[in-house]
Amino acid sequence: DVTIAPYSLLSVKGGKAEAVTPLHGVQWDRVVLDEAHEIRNKSSKLSKSVCRIQAGIRWIVTGTPVFNSMDDFVTLCRFLGIDKSLVQGMTKKIKDIYILRRTKDDLAKINERLRLPPCYFENVELDMYPDERQMYEFVFKEAQDTIKDTFKAATSLNYKNMVILECLLRARQCMIWPQMYLDGIAKKNETKPEQWVGRSHKMETLFEMIGGHPQEKTLIFCQFVGEMNYIQSQLECPTFRIDGSVSKEDRCTQLTNFKRAPPGSVFIIQIKSGGQGLNIQEATRVYIMAPAWNPATELQAIGRSHRTGQTRPVYV
């Protein structure tokens, strides 16, 4: 017998970390964790709950065993029953003994039917328009001054790190679409946001590239809801979207509708919400609007289209 269950069954909202679920009451012969990086935070209720499952054999499957640091890998090893003391200082040996790595090319060598069409990558470098550059230089100068003032003050290290991360966030928002920076500052100060009346070279180029391939379906992976809203408002073709606010039911509906939609349709996806766990081989054009925190996250997102079942070349 095989039981397939979502992680949500083990993550009881509002419950205690040691809460008992139906999966904890069985002595399993084997437990396989797909997308195992979901348990990488050892302090989370989900991670603690998953590690309490009773099983004779434990497997983990993931394309991103390390997100932020080797602590992520240590947590995965904990689920496998490998003591932390053995992992530290013996990472290479642990990898050689316990890890089986298979790339898409490896699978094609095993079975020719698993060979995928090529995936072509293009890094599009753009110069900012003068008004964009002026805005970004202002944001950069503000960030410098804020960080200097923070480090001069007698504040905790955690607070300093928070300030740095916020400055980086504002700079990223400005580079993607300046209006997001203005909206973010206004929300923080509880004021009415100024309106960006300038142009966005990145957005204009995106719309031009999409328009150049009207017979192909497109995936656009974004970081922020603000940019998703803007992109969707500017496109005249059929659009679909998944972000963090979309329920599981609506997520399935959006995916099904995109698959049935005519050529030229666009699926706008927040990368942290839909960058994994989706099969979207209908799309052959993939755009990543901004670098992800972890480059492996981008590869996961691209894999929504370039995966088993894809019959045409994919352009990223």
Which functions belong to the PLM regions below?
Residues 6-9, 35, 61-65, 103, ...:
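A short beta-strand-to-loop transition that corresponds to the Sensor-1 phosphate-sensing loop
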Residues 1-20, 206:
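Conserved helicase/translocase P-loop NTPase motor core
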